[in-house]
C-alpha cells in the first residue's frame, strides 16, 4: 500500500481506533462524538480540511461544530444528514416531491405495525427509522417473521431508540446501486456508481452489516 502519511508535503491524521489505519496515517484516540475535543485538536494542529465520514457524528452536527469554529470541513450539515439519519423523513421527502421509491407506511406504535401486517403482502421489509450501524433493516418472508421483527425493533429495542419508529416497506427485487453526487448549491458532480453488498455472508446470506 502506498504511504500516504505525507502526500506532497502534507499529512493525513485519522480519528481512529483501528490498528490498520495507523499503518498509513497518524491516528488520534478521540471519541467520534466528542466534538469539543475534535474541534480543539483540529485547531491546535492547524488542520486544513476535516472529512467527517461516520453517520452518527454527521447526524449529531459534527460538520456544524467545525464550521462554527471556522475550520474547513467536508460533509453534510446536521439539517442535511437527516436524510440518512431518519428513513421516515427520507421516504416522506421522496413522496412529497414524487421521487419514485418503494411503497411504505410509518409506525410509532408496535400495535399499529402489527395490525398493518395482518393484511400486508409478503415478503415485506422492516426498517428502524434511526441509525443502526447498517443493521436495522429486516427482510421478512412470512407474516410470523415480520411480527417477530416488529418485536425485535420496537419492543426489544435491539437498536435502541433507532427503533422507536419503524418504516414498513414494499419488498422489491433487483440490483441495488448507489450513485453519490457532490453539490455546492450551484454545481452537481456525479460520482461513479457503486454496489454495497450488505450481507455478512456469501451468497446473500446472513444479517445486514456495514462492513467494518
Task: Kindly give the residue locations of the regions a language model identified.
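Phosphate-binding core of ATP-grasp and ATP-grasp-like enzymes
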Residues: 153-157, 172-212
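Conserved ATP-binding module of the ATP-grasp superfamily
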Residues: 100-102, 123-125, 140-178
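Short beta-strand-to-turn element immediately C-terminal to the catalytic PLP-Schiff-base lysine
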Residues: 107, 137-142, 181-184, 191-192
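Short, charged, surface-exposed secondary-structure boundary motifs
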Residues: 23, 39, 82-88, 201-203
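A conserved helix-loop-beta module that forms one wall/lid of the active-site cleft
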Residues: 74-136
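Short acidic-hydrophobic, aromatic-tinged amphipathic segments that line or gate anion-handling sites
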Residues: 27-34, 105-109, 140
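ATP-binding N-terminal substructure of ATP-dependent carboxylate-amine bond-forming enzymes
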Residues: 1-78
Amino acid at each position: 500500500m502506498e504511504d500516504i502519511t505525507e502526500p506532497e508535503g502534507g499529512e493525513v491524521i485519522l480519528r481512529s481506533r483501528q490498528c490498520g489505519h495507523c499503518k498509513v496515517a497518524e491516528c488520534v484516540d478521540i471519541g467520534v462524538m466528542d466534538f469539543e475535543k475534535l474541534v480543539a485538536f483540529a485547531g491546535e494542529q492547524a488542520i486544513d480540511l476535516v472529512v467527517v465520514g461516520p453517520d452518527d457524528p454527521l447526524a449529531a452536527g459534527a460538520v456544524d461544530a467545525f464550521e462554527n469554529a471556522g475550520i474547513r470541513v467536508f460533509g453534510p450539515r446536521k439539517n442535511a444528514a437527516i436524510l440518512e439519519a431518519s428513513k421516515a423523513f427520507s421516504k416522506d421527502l421522496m413522496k412529497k416531491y414524487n421521487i419514485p421509491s418503494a411503497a411504505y407506511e410509518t409506525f410509532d406504535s408496535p400495535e399499529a405495525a402489527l395490525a398493518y401486517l395482518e393484511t400486508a403482502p409478503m415478503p415485506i421489509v422492516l426498517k428502524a427509522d434511526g441509525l443502526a450501524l447498517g443493521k436495522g433493516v429486516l427482510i421478512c418472508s412470512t407474516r410470523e417473521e415480520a411480527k417477530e421483527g416488529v418485536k425485535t425493533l420496537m419492543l426489544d429495542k435491539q437498536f435502541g431508540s433507532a427503533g422507536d419508529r419503524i418504516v414498513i416497506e414494499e419488498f422489491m427485487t433487483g440490483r441495488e446501486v448507489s450513485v453519490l453526487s457532490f453539490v455546492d448549491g450551484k454545481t452537481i458532480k456525479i460520482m461513479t456508481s457503486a454496489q454495497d453488498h450488505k450481507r455478512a455472508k456469501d451468497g446473500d446470506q446472513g444479517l445486514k452489516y456495514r462492513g467494518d
